[in-house]
């Protein structure tokens, strides 16, 4: 049994350590093992087994498991191994693998059934595709939670300004406690949120807000995630997806309550101790929010988000550029051993309209298609195997390929044959609308012969014919819709030419226009709701069409007018007062725009952004935004001035009511002493003085600062003469009111 048992030193041996100079270990007598250190026992088979005590010097790790039992390492720098020989052997094995990869054909076979969307999901910040500035801004917002969550101090930025202690958060959290990401679906908003949260050291807990509709259950779930300790070692970051699909009284109401409770707790921590009542009622005590919340939505101007947006840091996520998406898809093809041409990848990007998940799914489908075709074509010649053209020979032609074929004529084929072939492809494709839109977008850039503009004038009539046929879908059950397939063939007859040999990669503007139209429609709907709440009478005479074409353009023009050059102060103040009232009527707010960068203080913008609905020319947009910056700053100063005046008037009114209340209480007590009489006249003097201050403040609203200073300097004095004494000459019942008649 002892002879056949393998020695433990032979386990896990590597071929790399089989060479080199090895010294033999000395025997038992040489290393000085005594007979007392040898112990014997009888095994279950009756054999006697001797165990030798391990020497103390061998317990220091000089014997390796990769060596024989009778060998030890050398004590010199080489450790008994020829390092140069090992390096040469590793380089030779690496060259063999490289040559094998070069000589082996690219088959494009898939080794597992894993979805590529999950396989190539970004794991870290550097794996994200596009939107580098936006991603850094989101990472910077999460980084601001480090002092409150991880108890670490952030390094000061060189551009950071000194702020007073009263303006800082006591826990050094960001000003906005919720990060709101919005953008079109399919561009990776949720993936970005997960990656930046994990990159910052948080464990992600995701909730789909549109599915969570039960109020008490959702509230308990959110409170457990944000305020209770979890089994995970990392702090939790709450990610709420599809928040625009939730009802206002459900998920969003809970978030608003959390933010209001956090504001109360922060104010108590800054300005005073909590009340004794709050100590007794611990369940209703305000709680500080110490965990970040990331919300994701598609529609920023949804009605349910109006109450939540003031607490949010809003970041727009845009679709990645075609160049960055092409680089990522090309990398995936290289890693998956797929030989797909760049032109085919560009077609995938156009077909998916910038949707990263859609591109990767289509790429995996094409790879599996190549794999199945290669396996079924094993009996074909080698020249017909493993080519992109042969694998996609029987696949349907995409609509943008048909668009390019419509502008290309083959001089070696009959025109009639080409016409019927293209007609068959258009009818079988099922995307006649996209084909026609692509023809309309591409025909100004193709080569064709024309004297004047006769051909474009002719095609405009056929486009009108297509609109009439398309309307039959709603009027005649689509009976005339089949004639719309002839309109793309008119482009073939009119603009087809043999000089159009290269494909024109069109910019598919349909998706962008649809998203822009949806965003502008949401902005107009939000303004209509504001008008109905603020001015119901005005809302009854205002519709969406008049608001877009008649009201908003003139309102934007008035705000953009350069009234800072007016030297007449009264006229300037009057204009600013009217503009402030207009902003108040439409509930347009002036907010700070920080879209250029997270640490860069941007200019003021109007929320909701009416300039996106009104301004269409990009050059005019830049000019108006540059001119409007000073105007918005002046309007914001005027709004703050009106708020300060209103607070002063409210304070004076409150003091007047308090003094009147005190006066009425003293009248009821019936104090008739001389001291009380004197105090009464003093109180009346103070009351009259406060009344005059209130009247002066109301008169100075809307006037110049100079006139306001002159009015404030005017004072009114009251002289009261009182002769104390008693006389019986005239006796008459005198009431208290008679004294003041």
Swiss-Prot record:
<comment type="subunit">
    <text>Component of the CTF18-RFC complex, which consists of CTF18, CTF8, DCC1, RFC2, RFC3, RFC4 and RFC5. CTF18 interacts with ECO1.</text>
</comment>
<feature type="binding site">
    <location>
        <begin position="183"/>
        <end position="190"/>
    </location>
    <ligand>
        <name>ATP</name>
    </ligand>
</feature>
<dbReference type="GO" id="GO:0007064">
    <property type="term" value="P:mitotic sister chromatid cohesion"/>
</dbReference>
<keyword id="KW-0131">Cell cycle</keyword>
<comment type="similarity">
    <text>Belongs to the activator 1 small subunits family. CTF18 subfamily.</text>
</comment>
<dbReference type="GO" id="GO:0006270">
    <property type="term" value="P:DNA replication initiation"/>
</dbReference>
<dbReference type="Pfam" id="PF25361">
    <property type="entry name" value="AAA_lid_RFC1"/>
</dbReference>
<keyword id="KW-0539">Nucleus</keyword>
<dbReference type="GO" id="GO:0000724">
    <property type="term" value="P:double-strand break repair via homologous recombination"/>
</dbReference>
<keyword id="KW-0238">DNA-binding</keyword>
<keyword id="KW-0547">Nucleotide-binding</keyword>
<dbReference type="InterPro" id="IPR027417">
    <property type="entry name" value="P-loop_NTPase"/>
</dbReference>
<dbReference type="GO" id="GO:0005524">
    <property type="term" value="F:ATP binding"/>
</dbReference>
<dbReference type="InterPro" id="IPR047854">
    <property type="entry name" value="RFC_lid"/>
</dbReference>
<comment type="function">
    <text>Essential for the fidelity of chromosome transmission. Required for the DNA replication block checkpoint. Component of the RFC-like complex CTF18-RFC which is required for efficient establishment of chromosome cohesion during S-phase and may load or unload POL30/PCNA. During a clamp loading circle, the RFC:clamp complex binds to DNA and the recognition of the double-stranded/single-stranded junction stimulates ATP hydrolysis by RFC. The complex presumably provides bipartite ATP sites in which one subunit supplies a catalytic site for hydrolysis of ATP bound to the neighboring subunit.</text>
</comment>
<protein>
    <recommendedName>
        <fullName>Chromosome transmission fidelity protein 18</fullName>
    </recommendedName>
</protein>
<dbReference type="GO" id="GO:0035753">
    <property type="term" value="P:maintenance of DNA trinucleotide repeats"/>
</dbReference>
<dbReference type="GO" id="GO:0005739">
    <property type="term" value="C:mitochondrion"/>
</dbReference>
<keyword id="KW-0067">ATP-binding</keyword>
<dbReference type="GO" id="GO:0043596">
    <property type="term" value="C:nuclear replication fork"/>
</dbReference>
<dbReference type="Pfam" id="PF00004">
    <property type="entry name" value="AAA"/>
</dbReference>
<dbReference type="GO" id="GO:0016887">
    <property type="term" value="F:ATP hydrolysis activity"/>
</dbReference>
<dbReference type="InterPro" id="IPR003959">
    <property type="entry name" value="ATPase_AAA_core"/>
</dbReference>
<dbReference type="GO" id="GO:0031390">
    <property type="term" value="C:Ctf18 RFC-like complex"/>
</dbReference>
<dbReference type="GO" id="GO:0003677">
    <property type="term" value="F:DNA binding"/>
</dbReference>
<dbReference type="GO" id="GO:0005634">
    <property type="term" value="C:nucleus"/>
</dbReference>
<keyword id="KW-0235">DNA replication</keyword>
<dbReference type="InterPro" id="IPR003593">
    <property type="entry name" value="AAA+_ATPase"/>
</dbReference>
<dbReference type="GO" id="GO:0034398">
    <property type="term" value="P:telomere tethering at nuclear periphery"/>
</dbReference>
